Amino acid sequence: MFLKTFSRLALTFNLVLLTTLVSCTHVHAEKPTYYIYLAGPEVFLPNAVESGKSKQARIQALNQQNDWPFTLVGLYPLDNSIEDFGHNFDTGIRIYEANIELMDKAHTVAANMVRFRGPSMDVGTAFEMGYMNAANKPVFAYYEAKPFYGKDETPGLFADRVREHYPVSKDDPYIDADGQSIENFEMSDNLMMIGAMQTGNGDVALTFDDVILQIADYYLSK
């Protein structure tokens, strides 16, 4: 009788131990998820929602193609649901607060530094890059112009882009028409933005896919 009871207890213990080991193995086998805040002036496009969904789908496709030991997920500002939306100050503040929450959730940022309403990048995107940098999160960027201007562009040098899209002095190519100096440090945009990117890859990627691959390489190196 004692032996039967002991055998049952031993069997029960082994089953519990096996279940625990399987459970622990499953937990450790789960891939970590890294959230990417998708910053850029795409939110102003006529197809703003679709643009974000397309980028999120590309990230999902790259996950499947590369089978990384982690999963990358895009967080897009228009994922937020803003109740009682109106073109007023209160709505603007609530959008800002919702975007801050998304950035706090994100591990990194992929920012489109395309020229926007002038030779330089979108100011909201610039703030978001700075916010993520201040939070000690890696900053990555790319330059994608076709959705905005119907053609591909490369970022080039900021000083050259200013001369192309803003009036400059006839006497000095590094002075604008208002007599103000044009930043000239062999960078594609303002030095504070390029400086913030040194926490990530440091280079402005030429496509969205490229910037996601840069982010993947960053986490693979950890």
Please give the residue ranges for each predicted region.
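Bacterial N-terminal signal peptides that target proteins for export
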Residues: 1-13
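Alpha-helical protein-protein interaction elements
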Residues: 5, 16-18, 29, 36
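Bacterial N-terminal signal peptides
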Residues: 10-22
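Conserved catalytic or regulatory cores that recognize and/or transform ribose-phosphate-containing ligands
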Residues: 24-222
